[in-house]
Amino acid sequence: MGSTVIQNQETKHVKTKEFVLYLLGIFFYTCMTGMVGSYRNAYLVNVLKITDDEASLFNTLVSVIPFVLSFFISMYIDGRKTGKSGKFKPLAMFVVVPMAAVLMLSFWTPKGLSGTFLMIYLVTIAVLWGAFCTLGNSINMIANVMTPNMKERDNVISFRSISSAVGNSAPLVIVLVIGLIWKDNEGLQYIIGAGLCSAVGIITVLLGMSTVKERITYTAEKK
Protein backbone atom coordinates (compact mmCIF):
# COMPACT_ATOMS: atom_id res chain seq x y z
CA MET A 1 0.00 0.00 0.00
CA GLY A 2 2.79 2.40 0.96
CA SER A 3 4.76 1.70 -2.22
CA THR A 4 1.61 2.31 -4.29
CA VAL A 5 1.15 5.74 -2.72
CA ILE A 6 4.80 6.66 -3.30
CA GLN A 7 4.65 5.51 -6.90
CA ASN A 8 1.45 7.52 -7.43
CA GLN A 9 3.15 10.63 -6.04
CA GLU A 10 6.15 10.24 -8.37
CA THR A 11 4.20 9.46 -11.55
CA LYS A 12 3.53 12.21 -14.06
CA HIS A 13 -0.25 12.57 -14.30
CA VAL A 14 -0.96 15.79 -16.22
CA LYS A 15 -0.84 15.34 -19.98
CA THR A 16 0.51 18.08 -22.24
CA LYS A 17 -2.89 18.77 -23.81
CA GLU A 18 -4.52 19.11 -20.39
CA PHE A 19 -1.70 21.36 -19.17
CA VAL A 20 -1.84 23.69 -22.19
CA LEU A 21 -5.64 23.98 -22.28
CA TYR A 22 -5.74 24.68 -18.55
CA LEU A 23 -3.23 27.49 -18.93
CA LEU A 24 -5.20 28.91 -21.85
CA GLY A 25 -8.33 28.87 -19.71
CA ILE A 26 -6.45 30.65 -16.92
CA PHE A 27 -5.04 33.22 -19.34
CA PHE A 28 -8.37 34.25 -20.80
CA TYR A 29 -10.20 34.02 -17.48
CA THR A 30 -7.79 36.58 -16.02
CA CYS A 31 -8.11 38.52 -19.26
CA MET A 32 -11.80 38.89 -18.38
CA THR A 33 -11.10 39.97 -14.81
CA GLY A 34 -8.30 42.25 -15.99
CA MET A 35 -10.67 44.07 -18.34
CA VAL A 36 -12.78 45.23 -15.42
CA GLY A 37 -9.80 45.91 -13.19
CA SER A 38 -8.08 48.03 -15.82
CA TYR A 39 -10.95 49.96 -17.37
CA ARG A 40 -14.07 50.05 -15.19
CA ASN A 41 -13.18 53.29 -13.44
CA ALA A 42 -12.11 54.87 -16.73
CA TYR A 43 -15.48 53.90 -18.22
CA LEU A 44 -17.37 55.43 -15.30
CA VAL A 45 -15.43 58.69 -15.35
CA ASN A 46 -14.63 59.23 -19.03
CA VAL A 47 -17.71 57.71 -20.67
CA LEU A 48 -20.53 57.98 -18.12
CA LYS A 49 -19.10 61.22 -16.67
CA ILE A 50 -20.05 60.40 -13.08
CA THR A 51 -19.06 62.97 -10.46
CA ASP A 52 -16.29 62.57 -7.89
CA ASP A 53 -18.87 62.03 -5.14
CA GLU A 54 -20.63 59.35 -7.18
CA ALA A 55 -17.30 57.67 -7.94
CA SER A 56 -16.39 57.70 -4.24
CA LEU A 57 -19.76 56.21 -3.26
CA PHE A 58 -19.49 53.57 -5.97
CA ASN A 59 -15.98 52.52 -4.96
CA THR A 60 -16.99 52.31 -1.30
CA LEU A 61 -20.04 50.16 -1.97
CA VAL A 62 -18.31 47.79 -4.38
CA SER A 63 -15.44 47.36 -1.94
CA VAL A 64 -17.60 46.52 1.07
CA ILE A 65 -20.53 44.51 -0.34
CA PRO A 66 -18.56 41.99 -2.46
CA PHE A 67 -16.05 41.62 0.39
CA VAL A 68 -18.83 40.53 2.76
CA LEU A 69 -20.41 38.27 0.16
CA SER A 70 -17.06 36.61 -0.53
CA PHE A 71 -17.06 35.11 2.97
CA PHE A 72 -20.37 33.32 2.40
CA ILE A 73 -19.40 32.23 -1.10
CA SER A 74 -16.06 30.90 0.15
CA MET A 75 -17.86 28.98 2.91
CA TYR A 76 -20.14 27.45 0.28
CA ILE A 77 -17.19 26.43 -1.88
CA ASP A 78 -15.30 24.99 1.08
CA GLY A 79 -18.30 23.00 2.31
CA ARG A 80 -19.33 21.82 -1.13
CA LYS A 81 -19.14 18.06 -1.64
CA THR A 82 -16.74 16.72 -4.23
CA GLY A 83 -18.74 15.28 -7.12
CA LYS A 84 -17.75 13.01 -9.98
CA SER A 85 -16.32 15.97 -11.90
CA GLY A 86 -14.43 17.27 -8.89
CA LYS A 87 -14.90 20.10 -6.42
CA PHE A 88 -13.79 23.16 -8.38
CA LYS A 89 -14.18 22.30 -12.06
CA PRO A 90 -18.02 22.34 -12.12
CA LEU A 91 -18.04 25.80 -10.48
CA ALA A 92 -15.63 27.21 -13.06
CA MET A 93 -17.73 25.81 -15.91
CA PHE A 94 -20.96 27.10 -14.36
CA VAL A 95 -19.82 30.64 -13.68
CA VAL A 96 -17.96 31.58 -16.87
CA VAL A 97 -21.04 32.30 -19.04
CA PRO A 98 -22.90 34.56 -16.56
CA MET A 99 -19.56 36.13 -15.71
CA ALA A 100 -19.01 36.99 -19.37
CA ALA A 101 -22.49 38.51 -19.54
CA VAL A 102 -21.82 40.69 -16.49
CA LEU A 103 -18.48 41.71 -18.01
CA MET A 104 -20.34 43.05 -21.02
CA LEU A 105 -22.86 44.85 -18.81
CA SER A 106 -19.99 46.44 -16.89
CA PHE A 107 -19.27 48.49 -20.01
CA TRP A 108 -22.84 49.01 -21.19
CA THR A 109 -25.41 51.22 -19.53
CA PRO A 110 -29.08 51.61 -20.59
CA LYS A 111 -29.85 55.01 -22.02
CA GLY A 112 -31.78 57.39 -19.81
CA LEU A 113 -30.37 56.22 -16.48
CA SER A 114 -29.07 58.95 -14.22
CA GLY A 115 -28.69 59.84 -10.56
CA THR A 116 -29.88 57.22 -8.08
CA PHE A 117 -31.09 54.77 -10.73
CA LEU A 118 -27.73 54.89 -12.51
CA MET A 119 -25.91 54.25 -9.24
CA ILE A 120 -28.20 51.32 -8.38
CA TYR A 121 -27.53 49.78 -11.79
CA LEU A 122 -23.76 50.26 -11.60
CA VAL A 123 -23.47 48.92 -8.05
CA THR A 124 -25.70 45.92 -8.82
CA ILE A 125 -23.56 44.96 -11.80
CA ALA A 126 -20.37 45.46 -9.80
CA VAL A 127 -21.64 43.33 -6.89
CA LEU A 128 -22.63 40.54 -9.29
CA TRP A 129 -19.20 40.78 -10.85
CA GLY A 130 -17.51 40.48 -7.46
CA ALA A 131 -19.62 37.45 -6.54
CA PHE A 132 -18.91 35.72 -9.84
CA CYS A 133 -15.18 36.43 -9.49
CA THR A 134 -15.16 34.72 -6.10
CA LEU A 135 -16.83 31.67 -7.62
CA GLY A 136 -14.64 31.90 -10.70
CA ASN A 137 -11.52 31.76 -8.57
CA SER A 138 -12.23 28.03 -8.46
CA ILE A 139 -10.36 27.80 -11.76
CA ASN A 140 -7.18 28.82 -9.95
CA MET A 141 -7.75 26.26 -7.20
CA ILE A 142 -7.85 23.42 -9.71
CA ALA A 143 -4.06 23.60 -10.05
CA ASN A 144 -3.79 22.39 -6.45
CA VAL A 145 -5.72 19.18 -7.12
CA MET A 146 -4.62 18.20 -10.63
CA THR A 147 -1.91 15.81 -9.49
CA PRO A 148 -0.62 14.09 -6.33
CA ASN A 149 2.92 14.49 -7.68
CA MET A 150 4.35 17.39 -5.66
CA LYS A 151 6.94 18.44 -8.26
CA GLU A 152 4.38 18.30 -11.04
CA ARG A 153 1.89 20.24 -8.92
CA ASP A 154 4.46 22.95 -8.19
CA ASN A 155 5.14 23.19 -11.91
CA VAL A 156 1.45 23.58 -12.73
CA ILE A 157 0.98 26.21 -10.01
CA SER A 158 4.05 28.12 -11.22
CA PHE A 159 2.89 28.26 -14.83
CA ARG A 160 -0.63 29.08 -13.69
CA SER A 161 0.71 32.15 -11.89
CA ILE A 162 2.64 33.27 -14.98
CA SER A 163 -0.34 32.73 -17.27
CA SER A 164 -2.59 34.59 -14.84
CA ALA A 165 -0.24 37.57 -14.60
CA VAL A 166 0.13 37.90 -18.36
CA GLY A 167 -3.60 37.42 -18.94
CA ASN A 168 -4.43 40.12 -16.43
CA SER A 169 -2.38 42.62 -18.45
CA ALA A 170 -3.66 41.50 -21.87
CA PRO A 171 -6.68 43.91 -21.91
CA LEU A 172 -4.25 46.83 -21.95
CA VAL A 173 -2.94 45.62 -25.31
CA ILE A 174 -6.40 44.67 -26.60
CA VAL A 175 -7.94 48.07 -25.91
CA LEU A 176 -4.84 49.82 -27.24
CA VAL A 177 -5.15 48.01 -30.57
CA ILE A 178 -8.90 48.65 -30.72
CA GLY A 179 -8.20 52.31 -29.98
CA LEU A 180 -6.05 52.54 -33.11
CA ILE A 181 -9.14 51.64 -35.15
CA TRP A 182 -11.86 53.51 -33.23
CA LYS A 183 -9.89 56.48 -31.95
CA ASP A 184 -12.73 58.83 -31.09
CA ASN A 185 -15.12 56.48 -29.28
CA GLU A 186 -13.77 55.38 -25.91
CA GLY A 187 -17.01 53.68 -24.91
CA LEU A 188 -16.95 51.56 -28.07
CA GLN A 189 -13.36 50.56 -27.36
CA TYR A 190 -14.35 49.20 -23.97
CA ILE A 191 -17.43 47.31 -25.11
CA ILE A 192 -15.56 45.70 -28.01
CA GLY A 193 -12.69 44.77 -25.69
CA ALA A 194 -15.14 43.30 -23.19
CA GLY A 195 -16.87 41.39 -25.98
CA LEU A 196 -13.63 39.86 -27.21
CA CYS A 197 -12.52 38.90 -23.71
CA SER A 198 -15.95 37.41 -22.97
CA ALA A 199 -16.22 35.37 -26.17
CA VAL A 200 -12.72 33.92 -26.06
CA GLY A 201 -12.95 33.51 -22.28
CA ILE A 202 -16.07 31.34 -22.52
CA ILE A 203 -14.57 29.13 -25.21
CA THR A 204 -11.18 28.60 -23.58
CA VAL A 205 -12.46 28.13 -20.03
CA LEU A 206 -15.08 25.58 -21.08
CA LEU A 207 -12.54 23.81 -23.28
CA GLY A 208 -9.96 23.76 -20.52
CA MET A 209 -12.42 22.61 -17.88
CA SER A 210 -13.71 19.82 -20.11
CA THR A 211 -10.14 18.51 -20.40
CA VAL A 212 -8.69 19.03 -16.93
CA LYS A 213 -9.00 16.40 -14.21
CA GLU A 214 -9.00 16.74 -10.43
CA ARG A 215 -6.92 13.81 -9.20
CA ILE A 216 -6.76 14.62 -5.50
CA THR A 217 -9.94 13.72 -3.63
CA TYR A 218 -10.52 15.12 -0.19
CA THR A 219 -13.33 15.66 2.29
CA ALA A 220 -13.93 18.41 4.82
CA GLU A 221 -14.68 16.73 8.13
CA LYS A 222 -16.54 18.60 10.82
CA LYS A 223 -15.44 17.97 14.38
Which residue stretches match the model-derived regions?
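Membrane-embedded alpha-helical bundles of multi-pass transporters/translocases
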Residues: 2-223
